[in-house]
């Protein structure tokens, strides 16, 4: 598998498929999971017909970077990203999954998304324009789109299998999973965001907002909260170049901006069939993902 050839899907013979998400193919290996990040890309909640070469490698290697750096804040589910350390049945798939896979512990996923926002953008900006609040949190009047908030806020959302996640208040989250658990998730979410945003700022990147997912892992008769899925990637976060930041509108970003711009330009109705992306949009999007990884980590993508 050449470095430039995108991986749209994986079919690992002899390995039980757990589920297939918009980007990741998941496999069961005894009591563990193998997460393989493909190069699929979605927009408006649909997987597009084109893939972005190396996107899955960026997501996996950036998540691995953050899992390694945030262990002092919260335990995570990562075991290894080195296929030579994986169970024997996976060895014959090494060339396909190298650099884009992660062996993880199975957890019981907590059924809310944990979003931290340091800047007013996206769905938060839309809600603020309506009622001056975001997920029930009152904000100062007169804020502009992309303004920095007085302090980061925790804005949970429900997990949607299809379609958009729905923003909810802390109280609503408490009714779903319990107030004590929500309180601890809020603490962890804001601690992770604060740590990540500070590191990113030192690398010239603003983390406007980001989404974390957590699971529960049985340990010594107790349920331990564990950080799962992906962490501070261009797919789960809004990354802005600090030297181009100008509040009062949308910002340039290290993500699928070129894809969204193209889809808007061709007036796609956001329903199937999904369009193919032209080569220049694919190339520029790939470059943005790799630039985000290399800026954030100071390392070349493996």
Language model features: what each stretch is:
Residues 2-157, 270-276, 280-302:
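Active-site loop/lid in soluble adenylation, ligation, and acyl-transfer enzymes
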Residues 32-39, 126-128, 163, 221-231:
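Short, well-ordered strand-loop elements centered on a beta-strand within folded domains, enriched
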Residues 44, 125-126, 219, 236-238:
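Intrinsically disordered, low-complexity acidic/polar segments
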Residues 105-107, 202-210, 215, 286:
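Short, active-site-adjacent segments that bind or coordinate small-molecule cofactors and metal centers
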Residues 116, 207-230:
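Conserved metal-phosphate-binding beta-hairpin within the catalytic cores
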Residues 130-181, 224, 231-296:
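Anionic ligand-binding catalytic core segments
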Residues 177-208:
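A long amphipathic alpha-helix within ATP-dependent nucleotide-binding catalytic cores
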């Amino acid at each position: 598998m050449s470095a430039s050839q995108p991986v749209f899907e994986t079919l690992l013979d002899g390995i039980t498929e757990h589920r297939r998400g918009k980007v990741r193919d998941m496999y069961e290996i005894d009591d563990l999971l193998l997460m393989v990040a493909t190069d699929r890309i979605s927009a408006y909640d649909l997987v597009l017909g084109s893939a972005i070469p190396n996107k899955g490698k960026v997501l996996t290697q950036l998540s691995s970077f953050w899992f390694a750096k945030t262990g002092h804040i919260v335990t995570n589910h990562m075991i290894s990203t080195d296929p030579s350390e994986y169970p024997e049945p996976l060895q014959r798939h090494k060339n396909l999954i190298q650099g884009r896979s992660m062996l993880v512990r199975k957890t019981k996923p907590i059924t809310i998304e944990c979003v931290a926002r340091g800047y007013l953008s996206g769905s938060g900006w839309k809600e603020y324009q309506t009622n001056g609040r975001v997920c029930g949190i009152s904000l100062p009047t007169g804020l502009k789109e992309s303004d920095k908030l007085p302090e980061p806020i925790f804005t949970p959302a429900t997990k949607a299998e299809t379609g958009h996640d729905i923003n909810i208040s802390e109280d609503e989250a408490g009714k779903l999973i319990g107030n004590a658990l929500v309180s601890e998730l809020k603490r962890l979410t804001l601690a992770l965001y604060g740590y990540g945003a500070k590191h990113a700022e030192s690398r010239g990147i603003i983390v406007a907002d980001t989404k974390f997912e957590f699971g529960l892992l049985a340990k010594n008769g107790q349920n331990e909260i564990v950080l799962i899925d992906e962490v501070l990637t261009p797919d789960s976060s809004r990354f802005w170049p600090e030297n181009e930041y100008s509040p009062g509108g949308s910002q340039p970003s290290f993500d699928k901006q070129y894809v969204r711009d193209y889809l808007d330009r061709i007036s796609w109705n956001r329903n199937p069939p999904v369009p193919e992306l032209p080569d220049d949009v694919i190339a520029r999007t790939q470059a943005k993902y790799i630039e985000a990884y290399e800026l954030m980590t100071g390392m070349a993508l493996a």
